[in-house]
UniProtKB/Swiss-Prot annotation:
EC number annotated for this UniProt entry: 3.1.3.11
Underlying gene: fbp1
Keyword annotations from UniProtKB, A to Z: Carbohydrate metabolism, Cytoplasm, Hydrolase, Magnesium, Metal-binding
Location relative to the cell: Cytoplasm
Provenance organism: Pseudoalteromonas translucida (strain TAC 125)
Protein name per Swiss-Prot or TrEMBL: Fructose-1,6-bisphosphatase class 1 1
Gene3D superfamilies per record: 3.40.190.80, Fructose-1,6-Bisphosphatase, subunit A, domain 1
Subunit structure: Homotetramer.
Pathway entry: Carbohydrate biosynthesis; gluconeogenesis
Family as reported in the entry's similarity comment: Belongs to the FBPase class 1 family.
Highest taxon in the source lineage: Bacteria
Amino acid sequence: MRRLPPVLLEDGCPRELISLIRTILAACKEISFRVGQGELSGVLGSTLDENIQGETQKKLDVLTNQLLKDILLESGYVKAIASEEEDYTVAGNPDAEYIVAFDPLDGSSNTDINSLVGTIFSVMKAPEGADPADQSIFMQPGINQVAAGYVLYGPSTILALTTGKGTRFFTLDKTHGTFLLTQDFAKIPADTNEYAINASNQRHWQPAMQNYINDLVAGDTGPRARNFNMRWIAAMVGDVHRVLSRGGLFTYPTDTKNPSQPNKLRLLYEANPMAMLVEQAGGIASTGTERIMDIQPNAIHQRVAVILGSKNEVETCLGYHK
């Protein structure tokens, strides 16, 4: 099995970008260990604090954010970072070429029940000569990403990574601390009979999504004339990994549950990197009205609707939104 650096070198990745990705993964190896220790590590449960999103922070949210923040800023490879757990961007090396946005522990509410969690990250180039303290350097559409990925902490620790040359899976060899290539060029099947959505919010969805899901639930007695299965892990990283592995549709649509916050997922460090991974594997990633990676951001923690996965099924879903 091949190690990560030679694979990226063959793709023509700049050495500094490879070094940056390896820096991110160094933090993720430590996170994998802490998550794997569970109750033994003393970091399960919640803190008394909330993050900028108004969400109660888990102890592991704080720990994983600090690990990634420290190792990235100390590396010298980043001009600035943006994190789900930071109110504002954090300046790094003024001479660095790259900026990184990340969700340090997606699905952190799952830690207390020993279920799937993961780290999501997005890498872009900073505008030349930009001030590292200027948050506007992150206001770039997802098509500007030079790398995107996640590390899934499950029975094994898996890295899904793209640098624009396809989506690959690497598995952490915990004996040697090395990520090894275990699937070259993931390909999402165009058709599927699986979908992932938080069905408890159905009464709050827009009519288009309600109609689409109702037709899936109707199965072979409805207009789709075949049966579908629903899956829901309650961690985007887990649900998207299933889509990349065997196909499916994942969505967190716009809803009216909280009128001041109609969308759930963050554009910069959740929707954009997942969209790049999915598109590089032959899938589609949309808000329901536009391609996710075409969106011009207007805030660090901007939220968007997400519909992504198998090409033909996503296109069918989008047809309900026209």
